[in-house]
Amino acid sequence: MTLDLDAQKKDEKLLLATIQQEYKILAEYKMIESEKLSGIYVIPSYANSLQWFGVFFGRHGFYEKSVFRFSILLSDGFPDDKSVPAIVFQHNVVHPLVCPYTYSLDLSHAFHEWRPAEDHLWQVLKYMQAIFADPLESIRNVSTVHERSNAEIIKLLNNNRDAYAALVQESILESKAHIYDNPHTEDPHYIIFEKFQDDIHGPVLEQIRQNRATVGSTESGGGGGAATGLSWVKFKEGEFKPLSIE
């Protein structure tokens, strides 16, 4: 009887810990929503909240017009242990801090270890924005090439920007070539892209444009208010263009 009670208490404790973890992960997602990060879209997996699906849209510099799928992998003890979340791209991304073998993003220079009371996932995504906006700056404070994730790309970035840019474009094209691939998972939260179809997506795009015009008119008139609403990705002549009324 005592053993049964002990087992029941253990199960109840585990269930409570799981529920608490789910609430903390949901809070992380809400914080990301409140930050309104430009060009990054993430959502926890329906089946496993420790795995998130994400898409990054580059808008400036070397990575302008890029579209990179990635996953965020959280440790079993997240957010209460010291394990830093992992970001892994679906395809090879040419960048000084992306491993060419595992496609993982090196976060160690910004997050030596996870501090549950201070660090949050929105900060990780902000960091990702920053290192793609300025890849050279992202490795400026790293003491030696050997400490970096992609030493060959570092040398190329420092010595031959044109060659670096060409390799970046190759990785962008490779990623875009697979953007419409069939999902590798049946998870309903997996982010799916569809090619632009005038009869289906045209009315939505027009609604977005009208809402943007209305918001712009309101703001110019001193009405204030935050812009919220639909987002879309239009495919035309090989280009992806994020559209939103934010």
Swiss-Prot record:
InterPro entries: UBQ-conjugat_E2_core, UBQ-conjugating_enzyme/RWD
GO biological process, one term: sperm individualization
SMART domains linked to this entry: UBCc
Chain ranges of the UBC core domain: 20-177
Pfam families to which the protein is assigned, alphabetical: UQ_con
Source organism, top-level taxon: Eukaryota
Family label: Belongs to the ubiquitin-conjugating enzyme family. FTS subfamily.
Protein name: Protein crossbronx
Lineage: Eukaryota, Metazoa, Ecdysozoa, Arthropoda, Hexapoda
Gene that this sequence comes from: cbx
